[in-house]
Swiss-Prot record:
Pathway(s) the chain acts in: Amino-acid degradation; L-glutamate degradation via mesaconate pathway; acetate and pyruvate from L-glutamate: step 1/4
Top-level taxon of the source organism: Archaea
Listed InterPro entries: Cobalamin-bd, Cobalamin-bd_sf, GlmS
Coiled-coil annotated residue ranges, if any: none
UniProt catalytic activity: (2S,3S)-3-methyl-L-aspartate = L-glutamate
Family: Belongs to the methylaspartate mutase GlmS subunit family.
Phylogenetic placement of the source organism: Archaea, Methanobacteriati, Methanobacteriota, Stenosarchaea group, Halobacteria
Residues annotated as domain B12-binding: 7-140
GO MF annotations, alphabetized: cobalamin binding; metal ion binding; methylaspartate mutase activity
Protein name (record): Glutamate mutase sigma subunit 1
Keywords linked to the UniProt accession: Cobalamin, Cobalt, Isomerase, Metal-binding
Described purpose of this protein according to its UniProt entry: Catalyzes the carbon skeleton rearrangement of L-glutamate to L-threo-3-methylaspartate ((2S,3S)-3-methylaspartate).
Subunit structure: Heterotetramer composed of 2 epsilon subunits (GlmE) and 2 sigma subunits (GlmS). GlmE exists as a homodimer and GlmS as a monomer.
């Protein structure tokens, strides 16, 4: 071991039948620039693909995106699958999560009850989500920046 800081691995993808790719592309670039190793599963990703990727890459977080308004249906059971696989990872969900979403606090509560650690709307700045990810992983900005310097 060289003593060099190893980047934290996160899994990123658009769940279900959703084919919106722009948001996760922007998020992937922002996460990479912040020093994370990003495994981008792309669009129309099944729950088992998130679970398999998290397990095979020893990920610390699974970031789920959905913009077409059916995230609740697509995410139902995801945490059961993660638990069944023996994975203890942070889970974030973000986007336009519910059709006709008018009360985001209600949407947040729904997804928190489903087991998500953080819930974001489509207007969330990537830097805000990254800062929360650093906080949740107890990762200092200095450590993340060191990846870019050494990497």
């Amino acid at each position: 071991m060289t003593g060099k800081y190893m980047p934290r691995t996160v899994i990123l993808g658009v769940i279900g039948s959703d084919a919106h790719v722009v948001g996760i592309t922007i998020l992937e670039q922002a996460l990479s620039a912040a020093g994370f190793e990003v495994i981008n599963l792309g669009v129309q990703t099944a729950q088992d693909e998130f679970v398999s990727a998290a397990k095979s890459h020893d990920a610390e977080a699974v970031l789920v995106s959905s913009l077409y308004g059916h995230a609740r249906q697509d995410c139902e059971g995801l945490h059961d699958e993660l638990d069944d696989a023996g994975l203890d990872v942070l889970t974030y969900v973000g986007g336009n999560l519910a059709v006709g979403q008018s009360d985001f606090e209600e949407t947040q509560a729904t997804f928190r009850q489903m087991g998500f650690d953080r819930v974001f709307d489509a207007e969330t700045d990537p830097e805000e989500a990254i800062e929360m990810l650093r906080e949740d992983l107890q990762l200092t900005t200095t450590e993340a920046e060191q990846i870019r310097v050494d990497g």
